Structures are given as structure tokens and as C-alpha cells.
Amino acid sequence: MRRIMLAAAVTVIGTGLAACGSTSSSSPSTASSGKASTASCSNSSIQKDLYTKGVLTVATDNPVYTPWFVNNKPSDDKGYESAVAYAIAAQLGFKPSQVVWVTEPFSSSYAPGPKKFDFDINEISYTPQRAQAVTFSNSYYDVQQAIVALKGSPVVTHHTAADLKNYLYGDQVGTTGLTYITNNIQPTQQPRVFDTLAEASAALEAHRIQALVTDTPTAQYMAESQLKDALLVAQFPPVGEHYGLLFHLGNPLVNCVNHAIAALKSNGTLLALQRKYLQIYLKFPTVQP
């Protein structure tokens, strides 16, 4: 999923946004790791690899949330992931009007089989297990997980490593947050699993769970704008999680997309977008699970 091509970009991003996320991780893609030349990545050259000739078909979930998207409208080029998608499209020679958005639920995005899109951008973490069924691009964002609880909950005031094991958690099926709960927090109670993050959030509001875990930007948005009386309690230390664009297994288009991501790192575009949409997440404390 990740391979940094320019060490300078790693240094800049790592020092500027180390606490909230960067684009410095590397993971193997299941597609060819060969570098694509500028000529082979011209718009005319990649037409044969597109889902629909003449347009770039980009998938994400519905609903989508700030700061990744704004007003649940992926096509407006606002929010970090929307802006990244359009920046990649421009690198591949597409005009904004040639980017077509389609809906793909998170839970089915990494299932084996053909895809009805060129790539999916939806905070999808690279894992070796997922990479057996789909292909990931290099990283466009490295993230930390964070814990969300309601005001007045004991989670807010008592969140040492020992304390965290005693709470009832819930999360969306297949997410890094759920994996983090199980593998890192290791609570004494089995976490409750929901089909969507919205369902997990509703369970938190209804006091059917005491806390949920998700990436820091989403957690902050949920606490400040989506859920009544919720707080982002703290972040957890990085565990190597990073997001990549998702393709059908072996899609050759990933090589040119990786070329585009490398260019956006080297010219400062990704760093600028992180500072625009994600800089706020530096302020939250970090706790050990």
C-alpha cells in the first residue's frame, strides 16, 4: 500500500504533522511495484485501465464525514479525501468534470471480486489480510486512533491502561478501530459490533456502549458536531495504520496513481491539504492502552 519515493517529503511531513498523521509509511502493494514513467501515465495511456473510458470513477461511502468530506458531498472538492482525489485526478490528466463519484459501502469495499470503480477513497486502512483480496495504493495519510465517550462517563476521567479494559466498547465491523479495541485495549467485555459507524454512534448516545474508537479526525468531528454531549477523550499512540486508495486486485492503474501520490508529496500538496483540514488534531493528548 505504501512506498515513499522522496525522502525529503518524508522529513517535511514527519516533522510538520507527526502527531496527527503523515504520509510516510510504506506497505507492499499487491500490484506491480515497478515505477511508472510519466509517458506511460499520460491520460491517453491509462484509458485502457479505466472502469469507464474517459472518466475517473471514484468510490466512497454514504454518508461521509468531515474532515474527509464536507456536507456529505464528495464532488465539491472540499475535505481532505475529496481534495486528494481531485489532486490525483489532475495528476492523471482529468478535469474536475471528468471525475465521477459512486457509492461503495465500507464493509464491501475490500471484498474479493470485480469493482465498479477505478479506486475507492474512504479511510480504508491497509492490512495484509485485505491486500489478499484487493490492491492498495501507497499511503496518502497515516493516522492515530482515538476514543470517544459521553460527557460524565467514567471513561472521560479514568482512562489508564487498566481503566480502559473495564469499559464496554462498540464499533463498526471491519474497522481499524474495532481491531484496536480487541488487540490493543483488550477489554474484559466483548465489544459490540455494528454494521455502520452511525449505528455505533447511536448506541453510544443511547448508553448501550460506553465508548468507541475511530481515527482522530473522525472522532473529533463526531464529538464536536455529530454527537450530543460527546468528547474526544484522547488519542492512542500510532500503530502503523495508514490509508491507501483501494483498487480491484492487480489493477495496473495503481502504478500511475502511486506516481501521482509521489508527485503530490514532493510538491507539497499533500502536506498543504493536511495543514488545511487536519492540523487541529495535534492538540489532543495521547494515552497508552
Regions found by a protein language model. Give the residues of each.
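Periplasmic-binding protein-like
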Residues: N62, D142-A149, T216-A262, I280-P289
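Short helix-initiation/N-cap motifs at beta->coil->alpha
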Residues: V99-A111, V155-V156, R192-A202, A206, ...
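Bacterial lipoprotein signal-peptidase II cleavage site
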Residues: A19-T30
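A ligand-binding cleft/hinge motif common to bilobed small-molecule-binding domains
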Residues: S108, I124-A133, T182, E205-A206, ...
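Extracytoplasmic small-molecule ligand-binding "clamshell" domains
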Residues: A36-D120
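Extended ligand-binding regions for polar small-molecule ligands
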Residues: S82, Q91, S153, L168, ...
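Ligand-binding clefts/hinges and TM-proximal coupling segments of bilobed small-molecule sensing domains
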Residues: S22, S37-K48, T176-R192, L232, ...
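Acidic, polar ligand-binding/catalytic clefts
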Residues: S97-A161
